[in-house]
Amino acid sequence: MTKEELIQAIKEMTVAELAELVKALEEEFGVSASAPVAVAAMPGAAGGQAAQEEEKTEFNVVLKSFGDKKIAVIKAVRAITGLGLKEAKELVEKAGSPDAIIKEGISKSEAEEIKKQLEEAGAEVELK
């Protein structure tokens, strides 16, 4: 399998399948793909009114509330992001703050799929 074939196969995977792949790679090679969650400045924020008139192509999935199903939301966040239990719990506990970004700079379709998964788990989610 060439590198291009591997990349194409990964592109065709769902978010849940990618999370499973990351977990399997972590176990196989004894590494952790977890990284500290960093909040970056939103691209185009300084663009002003002209940037707002253009249709958005990149979205951030922001957790507004975990409702009364915190454990289910933590599990969903882990599956979506590939974070470890501690990191996912810390991220979920930031719900309602600007730091509660689950995914950044993703397509509208991927953002809506993630929003659907989180809402099914009991979370309140916003796309920005």
From Swiss-Prot:
GO biological process per UniProt: translation
GO molecular function annotations of the record: mRNA binding; structural constituent of ribosome
CDD domains: Ribosomal_L7_L12
Alphabetical UniProt keywords: Ribonucleoprotein, Ribosomal protein
GO cellular component, one term: cytosolic large ribosomal subunit
Superkingdom in the source lineage: Bacteria
Record-linked Pfam families: Ribosomal_L12, Ribosomal_L12_N
InterPro entries cross-referenced by the UniProt entry: Ribosomal_bL12, Ribosomal_bL12_C, Ribosomal_bL12_C/ClpS-like, Ribosomal_bL12_oligo, Ribosomal_bL12_oligo_N_sf
Role, per record: Forms part of the ribosomal stalk which helps the ribosome interact with GTP-bound translation factors. Is thus essential for accurate translation.
Family, per entry: Belongs to the bacterial ribosomal protein bL12 family.
Subunit structure: Homodimer. Part of the ribosomal stalk of the 50S ribosomal subunit. Forms a multimeric L10(L12)X complex, where L10 forms an elongated spine to which 2 to 4 L12 dimers bind in a sequential fashion. Binds GTP-bound translation factors.
Identification of the protein by name: Large ribosomal subunit protein bL12
